[in-house]
Amino acid sequence: MTTPADDQGKSPENPWPVRAVATRVAKYIDRLGMVWIEGQLTELKIRQTTAWMVLRDPAADMSLSVSCPRDLVANAPVPLSEGTQVIVLGKPQFYTRNGSFSLRISEIRAVGIGELLARIDRLRRLLDAEGLFDPRLKRPIPFLPGTIGLITGRASHAERDVMTVAANRWPAVRFAVRNPIVQGPNAVPQIVGALRELDRDPGVDVIVLARGGGSVEDLLPFSDETLCREIASCTTPVVSAVGHEPDNPLCDLVADLRAATPTDAAKRVVPDAAAEQAFVTDLRRRSARALRQWVHREQHHLDQLRSRPVLARPLQAIDARADEVHRAVAAARRDVRRMVTVESERVGHLSARLTALGPAATLARGYAVVQTMPDTNVLRTTADAPAGTRLRIRVADGAITAVSEGTDEAH
């Protein structure tokens, strides 16, 4: 069975008063107890007895108000300033009067260089395992970009070096410059915002992320996980030119091209107009020389051919061959005529022999061939022609039809 108190706050007819909600939230937060929290210090303000600051998480762009005794900051093992990465021990508090949330800390520790490097190394291994450093994912840098997106500190040496060197190499080059903060707790969100803006611009062909050298803490934003993943997700090629040659922030490994310095980035992104012009001029000169040499060589070869005796009287060889052809044709004709005569005589002799041996010659001497009709069998005995048998009698000049009247006895 529910009571009116249990139903309070569950309907517009029975709402909670502000004090009740604030009290409940304060009690819940109070039960959290002491917690260790890590973040970057921003907006550090020291008053007479209390120090106020904001503890920020750059990866998530979230912050938390923090207060502590002034002596806690003054007696810290290392000097604390905005951008310092710290670990604090504090108790969350909720102030019911104004509904604000804060953290009252009793201990503060600056994260050392060794710990920062260890965390960067752990992140490096994580990103490498995910394939963000895979060379096969690197996008090619365009040979001649129309517009270069440049992300760098305002009026910095890096900005001056990139733009000056690029303009000297290719005067027509254009820049889309974004000037975020490049160190400190607010650097990462501003750099990420500039990167997204330039990546969305269809006119930008390549993006250069440039910053001069600095300490590990100064370059820490360029090893931030959020920034590294944003670079990996860009569709526009990204060139990392952060720090000097020994520096190696994680953005160098994710970017499509790593430049040793901002000056080196300008040289690798923008071709040298003078060098390209010299290269083209040299190609034209070498091509012309090669063409002249080829023409000279072929002309010399042609002169050699023209100087040959056969080309002085080019028809002489043809005439000689023509005479040979005529003689061969005449000889062939003689041979054919002789062969035809010989074969004709041979055919005549064979024909005469066939005539002498054939039945026509026998018939011409008075003989006849008698055949029974209608089967045309040659009559060989009288028994083959009984009375009434129709006969065909073939003689030298034709054939006679007769009918057998019977047989006579041989005498």
UniProtKB/Swiss-Prot annotation:
Keyword list, A-Z: Cytoplasm, Exonuclease, Hydrolase, Nuclease
Entry's family note: Belongs to the XseA family.
Catalytic function, reaction form: Exonucleolytic cleavage in either 5'- to 3'- or 3'- to 5'-direction to yield nucleoside 5'-phosphates
Locations listed in the record: Cytoplasm
Role played: Bidirectionally degrades single-stranded DNA into large acid-insoluble oligonucleotides, which are then degraded further into small acid-soluble oligonucleotides.
Protein name, UniProt field: Exodeoxyribonuclease 7 large subunit
GO biological process assignments: DNA catabolic process
EC number, UniProt record: 3.1.11.6
Record-level GO cellular component terms: cytoplasm; exodeoxyribonuclease VII complex
Annotated NCBIfam families: xseA
Enzyme class: hydrolase
GO molecular function term, any single one: exodeoxyribonuclease VII activity
Biological source species: Mycobacterium sp. (strain JLS)
